[in-house]
């Protein structure tokens, strides 16, 4: 089975997250997307919503989506771990599956600064959700895209970029996927929710999630 691994804090989950996940699933013909809420990264100094609340909101937001599964794999870990180590572990646990790690353009452009980031393709495939505001070029305009990459990423990009949206290997393939435009971020949504501007937030979030937030008084000032 071909499976996309989509990690994040999802604090809160919004339509941009879901549209992005489904865009990758459709573009690569994946059998399943596994949304994996993670522990709050060590570099985030903000006190986030509880794991239980983030998980509950994800379940509400995805309950009607076919081929989308929520995994608590990372939340169940007792310590924070690096993406490279996580993908090694997941690959060992799922030898029958071909995994694709899904990431945004902003994260990909910093991949060389991650722990063993330049080695990530040796243990998995990568799908980069190309955001129009980040890159001015078309998804597969290789020459122009290459010029915008940090130097450490250029050899990786040259070697791994797939010329089509067809998964053909267990590791080593890099895909650039056009990402539906999203007009809001989780940070901006938290600002709306803190001000109890729920009607505006409903433009970007599942109403069931909004109801959960109101009922549990999340993101209150």
Q: Where on the chain are the PLM-derived regions?
A:
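Nucleotidyltransferase catalytic core that binds NTPs
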Residues: 1-221
